Amino acid sequence: MQENKQQQRAIAHNTGPALILAGPGSGKTFTTVERVRYLIEVHHADPSHILVITFTKAAARQMRDRFFARMDNQFFPVTFGTFHAVFFHILKTSCHYNGSSILKEKEKREYLRAALLTLPKKFYAQNDGKMDQEWEQGLLSEIGFIKNIGKLPADFTSEYVSRQEFMRIFVSFQKQLAQEKKLDLDDFAAAVCHLFRTNPAELARWQREYSYLLVDEFQDINAAQYEAVKLLCGGKRNLFVVGDDDQAIYGFRGSDPAIMRQFLKDFPEAKQIFLSVNYRSRAGIVETAGKLIGQNRERFPKQIVAGQSTSDERQDVCFVPEATQGARRMQGEKSTLPIPTGTASGISAAAFGTSWLPLSTDRSVLVCGFQDRRQEAETVADEIGKTLRQGKSCAAIFRTNADAVWLATALKCRKIPFLWKEKPKNPYETPVCQDLLAYLQFAMEGRKRKDFLRIMNRPCRYLSRQMLPDAEISFSALRRAYAQKPYMQEILHRLEADISRLAKMDLYAAVHYIRRGMGYDAWLKENAGQTPSAGESRQGQERAPAGARAHAAGKLERDLEAADFFQEQAREFQSLTELEEAMTAYEDQMDQNMADAADTAASGTTGAAFTTLPIAELVTMHGSKGLEYDAVFLPCCMEGVVPHKKSKNQAALEEERRMFYVGMTRAKKELYLSYTKGTKETPGFASRFLAECGWKEPKR
């Protein structure tokens, strides 16, 4: 392997601080491994005093394996570890902690619940006496966030409770940790900093232990980790950091790309080296991604160039690309597995009047706008099938897991093998889908009590379960039970008429009528706190904590998305029986498809009748970090999805742009960007990021 001049400068760096800005596909792992080798073989550094810190176990393992392979599998006692592993080793050695000292997830939730018992019930959601799990996880994430950024809890604005209440929760949580002598993972860095500041002897000990520090993915570091690393490197200042501020996407965990710029202030003598050649992606992908990320203001200015030609072949390969799960190199002939190429209805994308249009001169970047998500999912699934038949690795990358459901369904229907790395819960099992199903079942399959109990007060109809003694519901019996309440007669008459209408409709129309005609969507808004409920004034609603209002808005958004999903799925079936069978089979089919895909990846075959075949992967933008594929699909490139509608300020928008950039730069040969246009009633708009890439949407 022959390194380029930029890599050579980084590898040959001896002592003192250095900041290596490594763009996508620029060989940062190769450079880091070679630098460790160079320290040992050329500068005669003691390998036992070299510490390489990464963010994930997989990255640490990969770097260690590549180092030992480079050293002809001879053993050298270099330490490769994650921040958590390294910091816990220090705390275990110096402070006598052990494995049982680490707070388990179950214990963490118990501590939080104990802290919440001191709060008025109005501050948290209740569901049959149980706390809203999403709300609970949100609070735990906020507690971890302020620990990582080193912020005082009194200065933090929670999305869920007031500042005063959050302060009480945080203090109680930390008090329980101290009493039980436990350590939260998010406390590791702060605990190491406390040890180093209060015990100079221990600080000196660990500074002697690690004379050379190398930090990978430095853009993902948080304030607490950075402070600990600065203390550890000591007066020798042998701190070699590698990262790319354009790929900083973990702000929700406290990571801050501004720390990279702060590094140059803290270490003004630091050598700064740019690894600017992307050996992964074709020129069109590199240029298009560069246009996008150039819109960010808070970044190191840099110009990334392609190390590939505009053809599919590499022009200048000077290092072995990073091994990834996504980039499986298949041996032998390309697959002839008969994956269907048409959509479920046999209609191609072209028949809808859509086509993939080139965004780059080498046609490595293609864009397409679709009418709705179903059409987008079917067309992308067909394109994935074509890509797999050509023996290429590919992935569909989404902003959130929920966005992947449409494509997963389309792939499943076509029996296209895929691996869903972060599969969410069955979308049919959401409370909203179960409500809509209960309405359909009550109208079309008999008046069962269990279905009526679920729907009778959604929206509110003032019906009591005590008036429902029988297994089947009779509206005549209900009218007799409420004979003394004239207003209930009108409610029951309207409900019976609505149920009769539903029984005569097709599934799609029935769901639409439930939502609009029977007031289910309006009830969702009231239930989420978006409209004043009975007896509540608009002023009283507005006095709720801002965090509580934001949480309510998020809940409504998810509920309406679930209703949209169910309604679109209902369109596909001729009868309720067909829909029920599909819902029942969904989880089993999905699990089986994923198992088959995993077996395919493990064995490299699809059975005796077929040759080798890659499998498609579905992954989020966060989960795609560090991976690469021949072809990448980025569906759902719409405003409100990416950038996410919650991105209200410049910093949040820039992180969204970095996420999109990370997704784009996973592609080696082909990059497909798509969006949906929607209808007049519910229009969709292409993401501003497409325009920043140079895309001009055709006139409708």
Where are the regions that the model predicts?
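Accessory C-terminal helicase-associated subdomains
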Residues: L337, T343, Q390, R480-G623, ...
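Helix-hairpin-helix
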Residues: L453-F475
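ATP-hydrolysis module of ASCE/P-loop NTPase motor domains
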Residues: F75-P77, C95-D186, Y210, Q272-F274, ...
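Conserved helicase core region in the C-terminal RecA-like lobe
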Residues: T79-H89, L214-E217, V242, T400, ...
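Conserved short internal alpha-helix adjacent to the catalytic or cofactor-binding core
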Residues: V36, R363, C413-I416, P424-P459
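Helicase P-loop NTPase motor core
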Residues: I20, P24-T32, V36, E269-K271, ...
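P-loop NTPase Walker
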Residues: M1-N98, A204, A258, E287-G290, ...
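Conserved helicase NTPase motor core
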Residues: M1-A12, G16-I20, L51, A59, ...
